[in-house]
């Protein structure tokens, strides 16, 4: 069968000065015509909905029973406080996971991020105390302000997941009064767009140039999210390929002819499966790679000491099998 083009990936090619790991531009080319949209659409859907992340799913504020209330001495009402806490970006260590899922203990033993404010002034995410394995990324996030010296404790419950869960679903995890369930948006990918450009490579040949632009919330690097999306797709498609073992082992993508040629030239003569006598003769004459062999003319080959007619024929046959020629 006709092989598909082997493509290359360039990272941040258009912005060489970009050092923000939360943003990335990824160029994939050359792709067969039509594959830009096929790959782009599949990757975008996975990036926006399937990359795992962490999110706040419940909050407890000392002295507060439900979210539609006020706390004396606090600038914000409870609803505003909840909205602020929902913007927390948290990373959870892989050490707290087993088989890809967080081990979820009862809520009373759940790891809690906690802040206790006692003096008048603003409270930020950096003031949160985190349990082992939890890290707040956006430490400058404003949470609330005390209008006088007083003591207020806020406990924040965070879990790992994919996609989105509503406060109704999260409320099922809560078994005590005074804990307010919230919606949870787990996706660490804030934006993912792609663009496909047609590139004319010959009079009759068009290829696709696919460009992704990805932005994350900092819990995962853009390049890691990009790779994770591809991994998720591959893992879902592999079982389908396994339906037919002969197709499973089929080579679908092939390098360009000139790339294969360059790689062939770099081959050591040990890789060409010559007989011991032929191999030793070539080594003694200072020929170590295929490129060095092809730099010789047929006359040069025949003049190699102790080569013999049989070894000469073996070398000529091997070069012909590779579709290559000696120097004329």
Curated annotation (Swiss-Prot):
Region (Alpha N-terminal domain (alpha-NTD)): 1-244
Annotated GO biological process: DNA-templated transcription
Enzyme nomenclature, EC number: 2.7.7.6
Reaction catalysed by this enzyme: RNA(n) + a ribonucleoside 5'-triphosphate = RNA(n+1) + diphosphate
InterPro entries: DNA-dir_RNA_pol_insert, DNA-dir_RNA_pol_RpoA/D/Rpb3, DNA-dir_RpoA, RBP11-like, RNAP_asu_C, RNApol_insert_sf
Gene3D superfamilies from the UniProt entry: 5' to 3' exonuclease, C-terminal subdomain (1.10.150.20), DNA-directed RNA polymerase, insert domain (2.170.120.12), RNA polymerase, RBP11-like subunit (3.30.1360.10)
Sorted UniProt keywords: DNA-directed RNA polymerase, Nucleotidyltransferase, Transcription, Transferase
Any one GO cellular component localisation term in the record: cytoplasm
Enzyme type, top EC level: transferase
Coiled-coil intervals, chain numbering: none
GO MF assignments: DNA binding; DNA-directed RNA polymerase activity; protein dimerization activity
Intrachain disulfide bonds: none
Residue numbers spanned by region Alpha C-terminal domain (alpha-CTD): 261-328
HAMAP family listed in its UniProt record: RNApol_bact_RpoA
Assembly information from the UniProt record: Homodimer. The RNAP catalytic core consists of 2 alpha, 1 beta, 1 beta' and 1 omega subunit. When a sigma factor is associated with the core the holoenzyme is formed, which can initiate transcription.
UniProt family annotation: Belongs to the RNA polymerase alpha chain family.
Comment, domains: The N-terminal domain is essential for RNAP assembly and basal transcription, whereas the C-terminal domain is involved in interaction with transcriptional regulators and with upstream promoter elements.
NCBIfam families in UniProt: PRK05182.2-5, rpoA
Function, as annotated: DNA-dependent RNA polymerase catalyzes the transcription of DNA into RNA using the four ribonucleoside triphosphates as substrates.
Name of protein: DNA-directed RNA polymerase subunit alpha
Gene: rpoA
């Amino acid at each position: 069968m006709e092989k598909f083009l082997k493509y290359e990936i360039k990272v941040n090619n258009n912005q060489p000065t970009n050092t923000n790991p939360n943003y990335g531009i990824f160029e994939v080319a050359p792709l067969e015509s039509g594959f830009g949209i096929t790959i782009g659409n599949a990757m975008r859907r996975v990036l926006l909905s399937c990359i795992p992340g962490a999110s706040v799913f419940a909050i407890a504020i000392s002295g507060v029973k439900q979210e539609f209330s006020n706390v004396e001495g606090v600038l914000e009402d409870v609803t505003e406080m909840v909205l602020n806490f929902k913007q927390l970006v948290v990373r959870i260590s892989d050490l707290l996971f087993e088989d890809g899922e967080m081990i979820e203990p009862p809520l009373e033993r759940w790891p809690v991020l906690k802040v206790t404010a006692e003096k008048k002034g603003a409270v930020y995410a950096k003031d949160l105390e985190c349990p082992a394995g939890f890290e707040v990324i956006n430490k400058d996030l404003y949470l609330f302000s005390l209008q006088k010296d007083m003591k207020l404790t806020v406990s924040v419950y965070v879990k790992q997941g994919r996609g989105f869960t509503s406060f109704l679903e999260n409320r099922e995890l809560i078994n005590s009064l005074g804990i307010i369930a919230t919606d949870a948006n787990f996706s660490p990918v804030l934006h993912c767009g792609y663009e496909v450009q047609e590139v004319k490579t010959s009079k009759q040949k068009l290829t696709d140039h696919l460009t992704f632009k990805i932005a994350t919330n900092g819990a995962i690097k853009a390049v890691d999210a990009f790779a994770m999306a591809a991994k998720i797709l591959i893992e879902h498609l592999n079982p389908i390929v396994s339906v037919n073992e002969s197709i499973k082992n089929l080579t679908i993508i092939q390098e360009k002819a000139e790339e294969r040629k360059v790689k062939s030239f770099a081959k050591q003569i040990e890789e060409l499966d010559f007989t011991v006598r032929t191999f030793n003769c070539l080594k003694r004459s200072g020929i170590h790679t295929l490129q060095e062999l092809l730099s010789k003319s047929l006359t040069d080959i025949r003049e190699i000491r102790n080569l013999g007619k049989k070894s000469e024929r073996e070398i000529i046959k091997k070069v012909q099998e590779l579709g290559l020629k000696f120097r004329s």
